[in-house]
Amino acid sequence: MAGAKEIRSKIASVQNTQKITKAMEMVAASKMRKSQDRMAASRPYAETMRKVIGHLANGNLEYKHPYLEERDVKRVGYLVVSTDRGLCGGLNINLFKKLLADMKAWSDKGVQCELAMIGSKGVSFFNSVGGNVVAQVTGMGDNPSLSELIGPVKVMLQAYDEGRLDKLYIVSNKFINTMSQVPTITQLLPLPASEDDDLKRKAWDYLYEPDPKALLDTLLRRYVESQVYQGVVENLASEQAARMVAMKAATDNGGSLIKELQLVYNKARQASITQELTEIVSGAAAV
């Protein structure tokens, strides 16, 4: 059994770690609320844009934009949103597992995959396991802007425009609540038709002013950008929620460990006292 002094040192070490995890839990809770505010502010725009695009995809258009046309799939692209920092439980690895399974399904069909990474954890993971990473951006902080994301988005859209990609997906964590974040893979291009049954039963005709090509070029790019930005802010809220939960679990586990160490310390102390008393009694008997 370890000595009382050694056990006291372990207890002090766990207590110091517990203070750190508690502080990180509180910081994550504060950042999560701010991230939720940003997510709530951007969500109406992203959802409205998705509805508008759903109308377009179901419509009888006088100009059929390339982003609306299905192609034979030979190569797919993924915009992968991960975190820049760790200590957020299984948030990243669960996302990567889902992505790897989807990539394998395409690979089994003879389809090649390209990756554009947002977040350093995704970059380091696919550098280690292997993956065709064609673009990346890291270190965006807690308040990302669209201008920081535009690099990977532009690379993937250019590849799609040039016919080097036939499908484009965004991979990110969807924030449900503090305890639940779901890894999702959402198709961006070609634009998926709306799932609304009312829209499916109707035929839509549009008139464009001044020019359908110029309008759709701008509108559809804005759509992709809005979905990527929404994915990033939701992933950020998911990160802070997962970190808060992970740090709370670490703090609670630290408390349990301290109780166990305290019990071991008491037993060690009791054994030490018993040994001292035995030695005293033995010495007195010898006299």
From Swiss-Prot:
InterPro entries: ATP_synth_F1_ATPase_gsu, ATP_synth_F1_gsu, ATP_synth_F1_gsu_CS. GO terms for biological process: proton motive force-driven ATP synthesis; proton motive force-driven plasma membrane ATP synthesis. It is a peripheral membrane protein. CDD domains: F1-ATPase_gamma. It holds the Pfam family ATP-synt. It comes from the Bacteria. GO terms for cellular component: plasma membrane; proton-transporting ATP synthase complex. It is found in: Cell inner membrane. One of its GO terms (molecular function) is ATP binding. Belongs to the ATPase gamma chain family. Produces ATP from ADP in the presence of a proton gradient across the membrane. The gamma chain is believed to be important in regulating ATPase activity and the flow of protons through the CF(0) complex. F-type ATPases have 2 components, CF(1) - the catalytic core - and CF(0) - the membrane proton channel. CF(1) has five subunits: alpha(3), beta(3), gamma(1), delta(1), epsilon(1). CF(0) has three main subunits: a, b and c. This is ATP synthase gamma chain. It comes from Salmonella typhimurium (strain LT2 / SGSC1412 / ATCC 700720). The gene is atpG.
